Amino acid sequence: MAKICLLRLFWLGVAKMKTKIVIISGITASGKTALSIELAKQFNAEIISADSRQVYQGLDIGSAKITPAEMQGIPHHCLDIIDPTQNTLYSVGDFQRDAYTTIDQISARGKVPMLVGGTGLYTRSVAEGYGFGDEPNNPRYEVLQICLMPPKNLIAPKVEQRNKERVANGMFEETRDLLARGVPSGFLYKLGLEYRLNVRYLQGEIDLPTYYNELYHQTMQFIKRQRTWYRKENPAYTHYLTDPSTYLATATQLIQQFLVK
């Protein structure tokens, strides 16, 4: 009888164990993608993109979507899952539903689910188990969040350079192709930042110098809002990294400690 009780207690404990997930979040141009690939290779992880624009097919350059070569064989999820010609916005509830399903599938394969992206509402909806409507929050997972927050003096030149590189790599042509495929200009406008300004430039509303100036300043304003958001993350599971030179070593140590506890 005593053995049966002990077994019941053991299996009840197992049933109550929560799946562990790692979140790599942070401001725009902070280095999330490169860090996540190195960490995924180390910890046998699969990556779930947590970016509100990378879910759309064809929005590649303007959303800074990871390329197949950059993935280095690491499986990625929640990319290119919505046809933008349908003019359908993908909500935080949609993301949470898809993330839950994908996390459980990754965990069932014996791998580490890793959410990566700068859409803070997406990652928080999963970490905190947001309830919608009258539903209370119901956190499903044990969470470690590593949030990249390098200082402005490091980010500003990266933003300026990144903007020029993306235009050189065909960002205007990408937007022109999306419009030609039937993606409404109003839909791209709603996506903000690059795509809104791309449409304005292609329609002749602004010239190239104005485009670059507005894109830089609007991106920096967006990053400022991201910083405000991320400073309010749950301190119980969030660690802030500010020095890119120590990202990998510090994140590796944090994840090792998290996975073995």
Feature-to-residue mapping (PLM):
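Catalytic core of IPPT-family isopentenyl/dimethylallyl transferases
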Residues: 6, 16-44, 141-261
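Alpha-helix/helix-capping structural signal
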Residues: 53-54, 120-121, 196
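Residue-level signal for inorganic ion chemistry
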Residues: 51, 79, 118, 170, ...
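Phosphate/Mg2+-binding loops and adjacent switch elements
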Residues: 105-160, 164-168
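Amphipathic alpha-helical transducer elements in NTP-driven molecular machines
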Residues: 96-100, 120, 152-153, 172
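N-terminal phosphate/diphosphate-binding loop that engages ATP/GTP or pyrophosphate donors
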Residues: 33-114, 124-135
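Acidic, Ala/Val/Gly-enriched low-complexity intrinsically disordered segments
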Residues: 2, 14-15
